[in-house]
């Protein structure tokens, strides 16, 4: 798997809608070859790196601990056309605190009618889309249920931060 490299802009061209038994996908292309950041690590809990410049909308969001996450309504921030992310309604259906499941901590369901109409639910390319609940970052999308494309798994933001710290420490050691 790709472990390091440049981060470049991407633009979405179309959506292959997910249906029962066949996952959908966001289809796009790299917008240009200009690096906007560097990927340092690619592991089970996500990809980690840094941006050369902060994004235009750089409003800080508090990170929730896994014990602050509740079943119920939440929002996903994802891009399904062009390059502009939007918020969509989801439901956190269940929470799994088992340490053996680093990236399958929550079962989520897309409830937003617009997102369901356009994508059929969770599609390939949505992995990493942030999940917010009560104004805090609680996690990110990781998997789609192939036979129920409106549902999938998500990881706790707390688990992602732990790997970010570990990844940063490893890269600091390599650079030294």
How should these model regions be labeled?
Residues 1-176:
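C-terminal recognition in membrane/secretory proteostasis and scaffolding
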């Amino acid at each position: 798997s790709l472990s390091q490299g440049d981060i470049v802009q991407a633009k979405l061209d179309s959506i292959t809608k997910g249906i029962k038994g066949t996952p959908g996908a966001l289809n796009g292309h790299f917008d240009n070859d200009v690096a906007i950041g560097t990927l340092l690590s690619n592991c089970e809990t996500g990809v980690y790196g840094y941006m050369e410049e902060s994004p235009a909308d750089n409003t800080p969001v508090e990170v929730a601990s896994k014990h602050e996450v509740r079943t119920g309504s939440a929002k996903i921030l994802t891009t399904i056309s062009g390059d502009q992310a939007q918020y969509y309604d989801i439901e956190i259906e269940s929470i799994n605190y088992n340490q053996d499941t680093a990236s399958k901590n929550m079962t989520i369901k897309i409830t937003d009618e617009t997102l369901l109409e356009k994508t059929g639910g969770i599609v390939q390319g949505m992995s990493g889309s942030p999940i917010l609940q009560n104004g805090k970052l609680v996690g990110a999308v990781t998997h789609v249920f192939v036979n129920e494309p409106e549902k999938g798994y998500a990881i706790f933001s707390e688990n992602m931060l732990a790997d970010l710290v570990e990844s940063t420490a490893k890269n600091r050691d390599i650079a030294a």
